[in-house]
Design a protein with these regions (language model features):
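Acidic, Ala/Val/Gly-enriched low-complexity intrinsically disordered segments
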Residues: 9, 14-16, 21-23
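A conserved regulatory-domain signal marking ACT and ACT-like small-molecule sensing domains
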Residues: 311-482
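Internal nucleotide-binding/catalytic subdomain
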Residues: 242-244, 265, 299-302, 307, ...
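Nucleotide/pyrophosphate-binding catalytic subdomain
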Residues: 4, 23, 27, 31-285, ...
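Structural motif
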Residues: 43-44, 72-75, 149, 169-170, ...
């Protein structure tokens, strides 16, 4: 898909082109001295994680990747990760610097270890950027005992300086673009506006991930892994053609490889499918790293820096996923987790009693417990809770159910695992649920709970913890073509 660079004010320019500023196929952010309405190349945002920028070998790989496609114009980088087994991530070393300072111990030698890592890269690649000035500035601030967020963020900051010089791109600090309010709450709209305004000045740029700033200028970080969020923010703000997330795996797998040997790769997954898989325990991108791209309808491509020819996994809208998956496996993936408790409440004429479920939720709220599912019948409702959230308070919760709900009986089923079979294609095939239940029965797995939404995006079954691996293998064998 081609895009147009819109020059000047996006509202007025879009009107002249008979476009809308909300239309994601159009980039409303560039200001170049080119002919008005000039059609140009699409824009991709590429984020490279810690393993992809860990050493000189990896940096040369990412340079080849970036230079192989001129559409890769905005690059977001993490701090360097581990180079080998037993090595330290730069971010971990920086947090250790903060701990050392808090214990009133000298931090200079430990911080020098961090600097030496960047200096070695600088020297071996023959770079020209003045890293010593950056080190000195950070050292000066360290003497004022800055926040842990500031110290941890310097890993991405220093790495982006190096990589910008290595690529010949501009360095653009995320500090001025990623916005938080005075209470540390992220400001999406302000961030999008700041990114568009700043990147309008840069044709090619490297941006450090992981952090932004508070209104007073102090550094504020996202949670660990926040560089994924920064990449999605840049892609969403400019309406990129694609957000490429480069890491050390070739996308997502249809099942946990620790359970299923050599599971197939997921080539296409919708945002909704990914959320279902993530919620049920699959190791995928955090929702916060998906949302900024999803609302702008920007596809996300998970790629492997070490195998750049592999197309990886595409995360797209539901409509696009259905188009791309024609002829693929019925299911997209299988995920699950163990250690849940099911509390089944029985009460005659429950369906006629107003506010029953509301009172259940009120009790859970009193104990700060989020329910996983609430499958129900005419006179029954089952509350599925994680043992971690129950935290040894099951007897107290049951007592509250009895006194405030007055059920006829309560059944408790402990040590339950939940398994979600996810896929938009399931709704288009008759007998999907029957096939799943048959596969589990033939494997000798007793189903203790079933929950299927009306959208038929997923089927969740509850099995005993001991049958968890066996159940996932059985479902995979039934649905995935060899």
């Amino acid at each position: 898909m081609k895009k147009y660079l819109i020059l000047g004010d996006p509202i007025n320019t879009a009107a002249e082109l008979n476009l809308t500023v909300q239309d994601p196929p159009y980039c409303l952010f560039r200001h170049l001295n080119q002919t008005f309405k000039e059609e140009i190349m699409a824009v991709k945002v590429a984020k490279f994680g810690g393993s992809s920028v860990a050493d000189i070998i990896q940096l040369r790989k990412i340079k080849d990747i970036i230079k192989s496609d001129p559409e890769r114009r905005y690059i977001v980088v993490s701090a360097p990760g581990k180079r080998f087994e037993g090595d330290n991530k730069i971010t971990d070393l920086l947090y250790l610097v903060k701990t050392t300072m808090e214990n009133m111990l000298p931090f200079e030698q430990l911080f020098q270890v961090v600097c030496d890592r960047y200096t070695a890269v600088h020297a071996n690649l023959g770079l020209e950027v003045d890293m010593q000035s950056a080190y000195d500035e950070i050292k000066e601030k360290l003497r004022d005992n800055p926040s842990a967020d500031y110290i941890a963020s310097r890993g991405e900051y220093l790495n982006a300086l190096l990589i910008a010089d290595f690529l010949g791109f501009d360095f653009v600090d995320a500090e001025g673009m990623v916005k938080f309010d005075e209470k540390g709450r992220f400001l999406m709209e302000d961030t999008f506006e700041a990114i568009r305004e700043e990147l309008a000045k840069h044709e090619y740029a490297v941006i450090p991930g992981f952090y932004g700033s508070l209104p007073n200028g102090d550094i504020k970080t996202f949670s660990r892994g926040g560089s994924d969020i920064t990449g999605a923010l840049v892609a969403g703000a400019i309406g990129a053609e694609c957000y490429e997330n480069w890491t050390d795996v070739s996308g997502f797998l249809m099942a946990d490889p620790r359970i299923v040997k050599d599971p197939k790769q997921i080539r296409v997954v919708s945002y909704k499918e990914l959320r279902e898989l993530s919620y049920m325990g699959a190791s995928v991108l955090h929702e916060d790293a998906i949302y900024p791209a999803r609302i702008a309808d920007v596809p996300i491509n998970i790629r492997n820096t070490n195998v750049p020819e592999d197309p990886g996994t595409m995360i797209v809208s539901e409509e696009r996923a259905m188009e791309l998956k024609a002829g693929d496996d019925i299911i997209t993936g299988i995920a699950g987790s163990k250690d849940f408790t099911v509390v089944a409440l029985y009460k005659n004429m429950m369906s006629q009693e107003k506010g029953f479920v509301r009172r259940i939720l009120g009790i859970l709220d009193d104990y700060d417990i989020g329910f996983e599912h609430l499958p129900s019948g005419i006179d029954t409702v089952s509350v599925v809770m994680s043992n971690k959230q129950i935290n040894g308070r099951l007897d107290e919760i049951i007592n509250e159910f009895e006194s405030r709900l007055r059920p006829d009986s309560i059944d408790i089923i402990e040590n339950i695992a939940q398994i979600a079979t996810v896929g938009h294609m399931m709704s288009a095939r008759m007998g999907t649920a029957a096939k799943l239940f048959t596969a589990l029965a033939e494997a000798g797995v007793n189903i203790r709970m079933i929950d299927q939404g009306s959208s038929e995006l997923n089927i969740i079954v509850g099995v005993e913890n001991k049958d968890f691996n066996k159940a996932i293998q059985a479902i995979y064998n039934a649905f995935v073509e060899k």
